[in-house]
Swiss-Prot record:
This is Pyridoxine 5'-phosphate synthase. GO terms for biological process: pyridoxine biosynthetic process. Its EC number is 2.6.99.2. Pathway: Cofactor biosynthesis; pyridoxine 5'-phosphate biosynthesis; pyridoxine 5'-phosphate from D-erythrose 4-phosphate: step 5/5. The lineage of its organism: Bacteria, Pseudomonadati, Pseudomonadota, Alphaproteobacteria, Hyphomicrobiales.
């Protein structure tokens, strides 16, 4: 089965927030993505609400519950108490925990599972106790996947930023694919499902899914939104679903 596509809405929200106006509609374009076949929607609310606003979460939750109950809501973020309160209020199907500083522009590294296990374990247990699946953001050369499994993670999300950065260097892309494939095999052997995200495009997805056929889900925002400016949301989502099919 091809990996599922979760459309990250942060870039759409950032464009909306350039003006004190309700468009482009985050929920409206999320609806268009789901109608076109996306399996879910992803958001990464940050404390300053510079793109996704806390008020968006209830709207997206209602959209999925009322119109696309087979779809999934994935909320990403650093597990501060404020973040945990948000996810417990809106009950996404999946929570992706990332080690970001709140002021980072975007996620750029995975967890150090060895040093953060004691911090993460009770948080993972708390979220799973509320019925949420937990994914932990991971570097593809992490030495701590065994610890991630012991912490209680259901999935790891492989950070694919370095792979995305090799768009003009085939040799470097091949090296990054080797790292990602090795990491995915290690995670799968431990019983962890494998997600991926960051700088994925219709051009680099086919090679990734060929090397990681067990890939469960990709979360894509920037590249997909950029393509949507040219092709529109429905056509763009269809192109990404085709790319995921290899």
């Amino acid at each position: 089965m091809p990996a599922k596509l979760s459309v990250n809405l942060n870039a759409i929200a950032m464009l909306r927030n350039r003006r004190d106006l309700p468009w482009p509609s985050v929920t409206g374009l999320g609806r268009a993505a789901l109608a076109a076949g996306a399996a879910g929607l992803t958001v990464h609310p940050r404390p300053d609400q510079r793109h996704i606003r806390f008020s968006d979460l209830g709207d997206i939750r209602a959209l999925i519950d009322d119109e696309y109950p087979q779809a999934e809501f994935n909320i990403e973020g650093f597990p501060s108490e404020a973040f945990l309160d948000l996810v417990e209020k809106h009950e996404p199907e999946q929570v992706t925990l990332v080690p970001d500083d709140p002021m980072q522009a975007t996620s750029d590294h995975g967890w150090d599972f060895m040093s953060k296990a004691d911090f993460l374990a009770p948080i993972v247990a708390r979220l799973k106790g509320r019925g949420m699946r937990v994914s932990l953001f991971a570097d593809p050369d992490s030495l701590g996947y065994e610890r991630a499994k012991a912490i209680g993670a259901d999935h790891v999300e492989l950070y694919t930023g370095p792979y995305g950065a090799t768009h003009d260097d085939p040799a470097a892309a091949a090296r990054e694919l080797d790292r990602l494939e090795k990491a995915a095999r290690a995670a799968t052997a431990l019983g962890l499902a494998v997600n991926a995200g960051h700088d994925l495009t219709v051009d680099n997805l086919p090679a990734l899914v060929k090397r990681i056929p067990q890939l469960a889900e990709v979360s894509i925002g920037h590249g997909l939104t950029a393509d949507a400016l040219m092709y529109g949301i429905p056509v763009t989502v269809s192109r990404y679903i085709t790319a995921l099919a290899g």
